[in-house]
């Protein structure tokens, strides 16, 4: 896929770049909300997406910031924390997916990383009848806010590196506010924030595939 056309307002439009991969007879589609300073070229998210494709799930790797915005964010580090902006664009992307003839019959799941996890939670709360499941990798669910956490109904899995204590605490606290009965936090033994240790990203991909496989029916 080349570009997605997202209309932000009556007189404003933004073009976002994304990569859409659809295996044969997919069981659902996973939209990736990338985290701080990351995008569709992230090797970690590409790895997870490929594993999900192998498991029969379509994937959409998306840049939630334009190239100009990404350049600005690399200098200011502000837009990556603008959860309102990121979630608005993610919601528009979900609507695009549900109206696209190649994907409109697929159940939707969200995979959020870092600040992208907060955007995924906001989008899931807004589109509760559309989003079927969420997986967060090293996410910042606290940035979504308590009210959003209480509003999310989709089954939600938080994956956090065992050796990432600050993010572990943030995820454990966020989980307490979630009202959905299907919620879980899994600590990946020996993993740090980026899951760069051997075999740890494979564990993330495997757990994500199982979670989505259970709820994207």
What are these regions (language model features)?
Residues 7-103, 199, 203:
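Serine-hydrolase catalytic machinery in alpha/beta-hydrolase-like enzymes
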Residues 114-117, 163:
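Active-site loop->helix "elbow" adjoining a glycine-rich segment at hydrolase catalytic centers
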Residues 152, 158-160:
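Short beta-strand/loop motif that positions the catalytic acidic residue
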Residues 165-170:
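Conserved alpha/beta-hydrolase "acid-adjacent" motif
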Residues 196-210:
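Post-His helix in hydrolase/transferase enzymes
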């Amino acid at each position: 896929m080349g570009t997605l056309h997202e209309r932000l307002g009556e007189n404003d439009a933004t073009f976002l770049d994304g990569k859409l991969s659809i295996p044969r007879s997919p069981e659902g589609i996973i939209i990736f909300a990338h985290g701080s300073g990351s995008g569709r070229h992230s090797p970690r998210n590409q790895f997870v997406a490929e594993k999900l494709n192998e498991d029969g799930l379509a994937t959409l790797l998306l840049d939630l910031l334009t190239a100009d915005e990404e350049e600005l964010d690399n200098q200011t580090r502000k837009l990556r924390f603008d959860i309102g902006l990121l979630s608005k664009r993610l919601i528009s992307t979900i609507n695009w997916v549900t109206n696209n003839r190649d994907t409109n019959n697929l159940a939707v799941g969200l995979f959020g990383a870092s600040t992208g996890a907060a955007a995924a939670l906001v989008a899931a709360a807004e589109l509760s009848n559309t989003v079927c499941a969420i997986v967060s990798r090293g996410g910042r669910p606290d940035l979504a806010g308590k009210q959003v956490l209480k509003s999310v109904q989709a089954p939600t899995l938080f994956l956090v590196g065992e050796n990432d204590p600050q993010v572990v605490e943030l995820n454990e606290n966020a989980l307490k506010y979630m009202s959905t009965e299907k919620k879980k936090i899994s600590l990946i033994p020996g993993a740090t924030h980026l899951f760069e240790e051997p075999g740890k990203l494979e564990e993330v991909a495997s757990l994500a595939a199982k979670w989505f496989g259970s709820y994207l029916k």
